[in-house]
Swiss-Prot record:
The modification Phosphoserine is found at S464, S467. Residues 115-133, 151-164, 471-489 have a biased composition (Low complexity). It comes from Saccharomyces cerevisiae (strain ATCC 204508 / S288c) (Baker's yeast). It is found in: Cytoplasm. GO terms for molecular function: mRNA 3'-UTR binding; mRNA binding. Induction: Expression down-regulated by cAMP. This is RNA-binding protein NAB6.
């Protein structure tokens, strides 16, 4: 281990300390994150730890490292390796982070000593565990002041606490409440007013993007330039943290005569804001040089620090050594940045505050009667940049009749002045005071320095956590005498050592986002490495009021349109609780804690799913109880961001439309404008341009954005859409009228009793229908043109209603209010009656008619941008109802298929595809219908006898199949050929005597019955060697000759549409229904001769059809072979 007094790498040490402090501040705004405890010097001091933090929604907390871990001492100093180890000491959980500070600890400049005889902590506490723990977190520095931070016992519901302001308290519901401590509670205002602000800044090297900070120094500015004019014209004031003038600069272009010019030091809230301002200057450098009256304008990035000696709580102590004092100054600078960050992030603090007065205040009485403490004769600390005094007769929605807007040089001044006003408001006659944000009245495109930054919480939410300096007193040797200064003016200091600590330890310039607590490690390492060994000059500056002009008081008789209340201030009752401090801890981290019952252990289910009731889990969660307010705020932020990114001003409602066709009218332009109701339309036909002003700024932003998605074409010209001049705030009269439905459209209609058919039988219908009528369109235009220009009159064909569209909504409001105005009239009998203005104006033409607001068609939604049938971007979207219809259609289709299958099974079998024809013959008087032309037949005489007796059936071989008469002649002619074929293919007649021909599957009852009948007939013929006589005398079956050439030309059987059938009805089919008469068979033969009405079948059915074809070919081949064998058996002697 190295000696504790040895020098440490300054840059690496500053980087490590910054990571710790960034992590702690990130957890301040994260309600789901807990930070582990690091025990310092055995006193249980609560502070940043090298241990990684864990989240409560993780399955298990991280196990704290021990000295026996290999990487335990990687990030600790040698003197800290064994401190806080649970194996060396077993600290008490309750007293571990509430123990009193050790007597040997050096007092910090930002921490008052805890004693019973001082005036800073007058309330003594007998329990030493509840005294100050010595650590001030950034989030509670200004809130807690110099009071001790106590951690109370969690084992009881009623928490015992100190009575000092800012301490941990609980309300009736058990939730913690923290009251922000006023800095003027413990210090005299007269003493603080004589202590000016002081800053230190170092000019960083140029030529490298790594040296970019949030502070910029503008050199060689003319002495006549006013600071307020620069900020007003070039910078959005709510993005500035501070702005200072530096006297005594020497002009570079003057060699002989030393001419003193000014330098302006501007510090922004974020580094991004500063870079935007810097790039804007470079793009318009000539314009800036002309405005600032400087041809040798120079820009430099600087590292800005606040001197902790200007703190309200700073105490000079002779007991502190020089090194300890330097360390206290270093830490005090960090605490100023931390407290400033806290107020900006949680209170939306700005450089401007508003003071409301109960009565009108004259310009001369502002500093004499109301703000005496800001008079320059008594005040050296708070310097004003501008003052706006407003005295009106009517209050606005946000402000009263009498108020003043004060803008200071930096935000810290505004914070302290606001504390003073809140404490002495009764004596000063002040009703309210709060932060406000200022925006330029008219921001030109050339002077808009922060085009991509919008007002509101977006800038403050990107505020970064300030860096942390070395806390060890030994490291203060690196800074030697850097902070020694001369309070009377500006002193240049030479830093002979590395400034790694100065850049990251003394500065709040390296700010990281609250939303992302991850620092830019690569940039930090690179910058720290580059600055090692580089000597830079540091400048000490006292903010002296003599260097600034006396602020001019601008009086106004109307409300300021560029002043807006801070969003957090508007919802102050919802964000009354500050971030709790010290941070609540989870006691799972301490394995050897003997007093586990004193703390509340978070159950496993709460770790996985945090409960919104537990204050430990929800530390600073901002929840808006009103969803409407939250939605409006979100819409405003989004529209403001889009407008800023598109080059518009915040709240601009005017749209420019160019490239209009000469034959287009104002009516045509309104037909293509969609997205929001309009306030006015200003059409200039000579210039072919038009300016359209919406009621709401988000509507204008939406229309502007939609014009790029869906370009507008009017009369063949594609319209150019841009931003018009800033329209200013919406007048209060119009905003109130819009809430009750006002628009540019006014309708004039007959009463419903005069034209609706449902009242045709009403007695009033006939009377009103005959007496009331609408004037024609020309008369309407002549009468209502007195209120303003008319864009369009839409007159219905049935003449019971019409709509008048004005060019300005104010004209419509005036018309409706005047026509519906009622006055009291007293008749001769003394009765008082109400009389409407419509009965007297325009000759009584509108008496009895209804006149009210209609619907502005410009407020309709652009149908081209929604999923509809009329949209060019229409895409068919399947809805649940569509799926239901599909399922119903599919079910109906399946039912139809089942019905068709059942009908198909009811039809008789078609044997024609197998080469077998079934013909029914009836005996009409005898005669030979068939002749057995089989030469050499043993029983030829018997066949002839049977033919003569009416058995007109010809047998075919030993199969006993009847030959139809139509095929006898063809069979006779081919007999010789068949004999040759059969003799070659068959051996003996006995081999085929017992062969059964299976025509269908035995599993089918109907087809099994058919095949069984045929088999029995065949076996009878074969065994008896004679033809078979069918039992049915009236109907005979003739089977055609088996000609393989003709049978193979038949269409093969089609595969069934499915592999499963329902044959419940087929079993009931009688045997005689299988064979129909000749007429039916002939008709069926014509219908089923070909494949008609093909349909798509699945793959399984295709395979079944293929198998059926193979079976058909095999069957035909077997039938031919069997036929040859049977015929061969009939001639055994041959």
């Amino acid at each position: 281990m190295s000696n504790s007094n040895s020098k440490k790498p300054v840059a690496n040490y500053a980087y490590r300390q910054q990571q710790d402090y960034n992590g702690m501040n990130a957890m301040v705004g994260n309600p789901m994150m807990y930070h582990p405890v690091d025990f310092v010097n055995g006193a249980g001091q609560y502070g940043p730890s090298q241990h990684p933090a864990y989240y409560t929604n993780s399955p298990l907390p991280n196990i704290p490292p021990t000295p026996f871990d290999t990487a335990y001492g990687a990030s600790l100093f040698p003197s800290h390796l064994l401190m806080g180890s649970p194996f060396v000491s077993s600290p008490n959980m309750q007293s571990g982070y509430n123990s009193a500070r050790s007597s040997n600890l050096k007092r910090k400049a930002y921490s008052r000593p805890v004693s019973n005889h001082n005036g800073y902590n007058g309330n003594s506490n007998s329990n030493q565990n509840n005294t100050n723990n010595g650590m001030v977190t950034p989030s509670n520095y200004y809130r807690m002041g110099r009071n001790s931070f106590s951690r109370n016992n969690n084992s009881t519901r009623n928490v015992t606490h100190n009575n000092n302001k800012g301490c941990d308290t609980r309300n009736n519901s058990g939730r913690r409440t923290f009251a922000r401590n006023n800095i003027f509670d413990d210090i005299l205002p007269e003493m603080l007013l004589q202590r000016p602000f002081c800053i230190n800044y170092k000019v960083l090297p140029t030529g490298d993007d790594a040296y970019r900070t949030r502070s910029l120094l503008i050199e060689n500015v003319d002495h006549s330039i006013d600071l307020h004019s620069i900020v007003k014209n070039f910078v959005k004031s709510n993005t500035l943290e501070s702005a200072y003038l530096i006297e005594g600069g020497k002009s570079d272009d003057s060699k002989d005569v030393e001419t003193k010019n000014l330098s302006i030091l501007i510090s922004f809230l974020t580094k991004g804001d500063c870079l935007n301002f810097y790039n804007n200057i470079l793009q318009r450098l000539s314009e800036f040089k002309t405005f600032l009256k400087s041809e040798a304008l120079n820009l430099k990035f600087v590292c800005l620090n606040y001197d902790p000696k200007c703190l309200p709580t700073f105490i000079e102590s002779e007991a502190l050594t020089e090194n300890a004092e330097e360390a206290d100054i270093t830490n005090g600078s960090t605490m100023i940045s931390a407290s400033l960050h806290h107020n900006i992030a949680n209170k939306d603090a700005t450089r401007s505050i508003i003071i409301e007065f109960k009565s009108p205040v004259e310009k001369s009485d502002l500093f004499k009667k109301k703000l005496q403490f800001l008079d320059r004769s008594k005040n050296k600390r708070y310097i004003l940049e501008s003052i706006d005094l407003v005295n009106t007769d009517v209050p606005s929605n946000q402000f009263p009749e009498n108020y003043a807007v004060l803008t200071f040089l930096n935000i810290s001044m505004a914070i302290e002045v606001l504390d003073y006003l809140k404490k002495y408001s009764k004596n000063l006659g002040i009703s309210k005071c709060f932060y406000v944000s200022l925006a330029p009245l008219v921001v030109s495109s050339a002077r808009s320095s922060v085009a991509n930054i919008y007002e509101g919480k977006t800038s403050t939410h990107r505020l970064s956590v300030p860096s942390v300096t070395a806390g060890n007193n030994n490291d203060s040797n690196n800074n030697g005498n850097n902070n020694k200064s001369n309070m009377s003016g500006i002193t240049t200091l030479n830093n002979n050592s590395s400034i790694g600590v100065s850049v990251y330890g003394h500065s709040n310039m390296s700010l990281t986002s609250l939303s992302s607590s991850v620092s830019l490690n690569e940039e930090i390492d690179m910058l720290a490495t580059k600055l090692q060994g580089v000597e830079l000059d540091g400048t000490y500056l006292e903010i002296n009021y003599r260097d600034y002009q006396t602020p001019t008081i601008e009086e106004h008789s109307t409300h300021l349109s560029n002043v807006k209340i801070s969003k957090t201030t508007e919802n102050s009752r919802q964000f009354s609780q500050d971030i709790p401090s010290p941070l609540p801890l989870n006691e799972h981290m301490f394995m050897n804690d003997s007093n586990q019952s004193n703390g509340a252990i978070i159950p496993q289910q709460l770790i996985a799913t945090p409960s919104p009731v537990s204050p430990n889990l929800q530390m600073n969660q901002r929840v808006l109880p009103n969803p409407i307010t939250q939605s409006l705020e979100q819409n405003f932020n989004v529209s403001a961001k889009v407008a800023s990114s598109m080059g518009s001003d915040i709240g601009n409602r005017t749209i420019y439309i160019g490239n209009i066709n000469p034959r287009s009218k104002a009516e045509d332009i309104c037909n293509v404008v969609r997205g929001g109701i309009l306030q006015s339309i200003k059409y200039i036909p000579e210039k072919k341009i038009c300016f359209v002003t919406f009621i709401e700024a988000p509507s204008a932003v939406q229309f502007y954005a939609n014009s790029f998605i869906d370009p507008i074409v009017l009369h063949g010209n594609m319209l150019r859409v841009g931003w018009g001049h800033y329209s200013g705030p919406l007048p209060k009269l119009i905003s109130l009228a819009v809430t009750i439905g006002a628009s540019r459209n006014v309708y004039v209609s007959l009463p419903e009793f005069a034209f609706k058919e449902k009242f045709i039988h009403d007695p009033q219908y006939k009377k009103l229908h005959e007496t009331l009528s609408l004037p024609d369109a020309e008369q309407l235009r002549e009468d209502f043109s007195t209120y303003g220009d008319i864009e369009q009159i839409n007159y219905l064909s049935d003449s019971h209603c019409c709509w008048i569209n004005f060019m300005n909504i104010s004209s419509a409001i005036s018309l409706v209010e005047e026509m519906n105005k009622e006055s009291t009239v007293q008749n001769e009998s003394g009765e008082v009656t109400l009389k409407r203005a419509t009965e007297e104006k325009f000759g009584g033409r509108y008496k009895g008619l209804l006149i009210n607001y209609g619907k502005d068609r410009c407020g309709n939604i652009n149908k081209n941008l929604i999923a509809g049938k009329n949209s060019r971007f229409y895409k068919k979207v399947k809805r649940p109802s569509y799926n239901i219809r599909l399922s119903k259609l599919e079910e109906k289709r399946r039912q139809n298929e089942i019905d068709e299958k059942e009908k198909a099974f009811d039809k008789p079998l078609n044997l024609e595809s197998l080469g077998i024809s079934l013909d029914a013959h009836k005996d009409n008087g005898g005669g030979e219908t068939g002749t057995a032309n089989n030469t050499g037949h043993e029983n030829e005489s018997e066949l002839e006898a049977e033919n003569e007796n009416g058995n007109e059936t010809g047998s075919f071989g030993g199969l006993g199949l009847a030959v139809a008469s139509s095929d006898v002649k063809r069979a006779t002619s081919d007999e010789t050929d068949y004999e040759d074929i059969f003799n070659k293919s068959s051996g003996s007649s006995d081999s085929s005597s017992d062969v059964e021909v299976i025509m269908h599957s035995p599993s089918d009852p109907e087809y099994a019955l058919k095949s069984q009948t045929l088999r029995s007939s065949s076996q009878t013929v074969i065994n008896s060697k004679r033809p078979v006589k069918i039992e049915d005398e009236e109907e005979a079956v003739g089977m055609s000759q088996l000609n393989y050439r003709s049978s193979l030309r038949q269409a093969p059987p089609r595969a069934p549409s499915t592999l499963s059938y329902n044959h419940s009805k087929n079993n009931e089919t009688p045997m005689q229904d299988i064979f129909t008469n000749g007429e039916t068979a002939n008709n069926r033969k014509k219908k089923r001769g070909s494949f008609a009405r093909h349909r798509t079948i699945p793959g399984s059915d295709v395979m079944a059809q293929y198998l059926a074809q193979v079976q058909h070919s095999t069957f035909m081949y077997a039938a031919n072979i069997l036929g040859a064998s049977a015929e061969d058996n009939t001639h055994p002697d041959e």
